[in-house]
Amino acid sequence: MPKKRNSELGSLARTPKGNSTCDRIVAAARKKLVENGVDGFSLRELATSLDLKLSNVQYYFKTREALLLHVFEREAAADVAVIEAKRSSGSEREAFRAIVRELVIRWRGDSGILMSTLGTISLHHKEFRGLYRSIYKAFYRALEAPVRGMNNELDDDEVRLRVRLVTALVDGSPMQTRVGDLQIFLDRVQDQAEQIARS
């Protein structure tokens, strides 16, 4: 997970009960952000929906922005965890294809909504821009080993370039509409990503 960038984060949970409350807040915030977008997101309404006082939410996240940053950080950490988990999925080729497939599936759902939201916010808010960049930096770093595994003759600069090309393909594919049979589409995305990494 990227390092916390926001000094307004409250004292995060130090007890099992505190951890549970913090997790409930983050899960509910994620759901509301996916359903209503950032304009419809408020700490007060979130607290009410959880049957908590606003001050209870603010104990963990002093501001709306602090909570949003945490939701985005956690979502990005889950993407990196997918890469790490899938690296043991058979051969280097099978693992790489599994990573690409799983990321495209995730990004066609709620995860894609959240990361698109972060991308939009980052255009206008410096703190979110910093988080957006650090998320992609961590993502690129996690993807380097699977790309290198596809062609171990590549130098570091070429690996970094191919990581970005694979990311561009995987990042953009969930935004496409009318893709026809989803399984065929996913297979083709995997084929193209493999070609980028291997050739």
Sequence positions of predicted segments:
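N-terminal intrinsically disordered/low-complexity leader segments
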Residues: 1-20
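Helix-turn-helix
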Residues: 21-24, 28-66, 70
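Solvent-exposed, amphipathic alpha-helical segments
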Residues: 24, 28-36, 82, 114, ...
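Hydrophobic alpha-helical connector segments
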Residues: 70, 81-112, 162-166
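Short, basic, alpha-helical segments at the C-terminal edge of helix-turn-helix-like DNA-binding modules
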Residues: 73-79
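Amphipathic alpha-helical segments used for helix-helix packing
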Residues: 108-130
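Hydrophobic/aromatic-rich alpha-helical bundle segments in the mid-to-C-terminal region
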Residues: 129-133, 150-199
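Short, solvent-exposed amphipathic helices
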Residues: 131-142
